[in-house]
């Protein structure tokens, strides 16, 4: 199947619900005020993309990857991030998650060294089998919760 390719695009105000996206590649794209709800992505790549004020809810992924993504002021609900890991020894799925609301997320089998979750609201999420340096301040908060 032929891949649909986007590079350097700004994608605004798109609402995609209960759809399957196959063979899309987004390089250096910005997503602003977009919504992806109950979507399935198959053989898709998001590389060096930024998401601002987006809702991503119950995303299902197969053979897809995110590389060096940034999320700011987003609602990220029901995402299994381990299923979106990029190939390559030094590739990073997430560059930054800032001022976001995360609920029912699963972070597993990921290298999150040097990653900072401060400034985000995280509820009912799982962190498993990670390589991660948790700052002492966050360790204290996690013990209280």
Placement of each model-derived feature along the sequence:
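Tandem repeat scaffolds
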Residues: 1-145
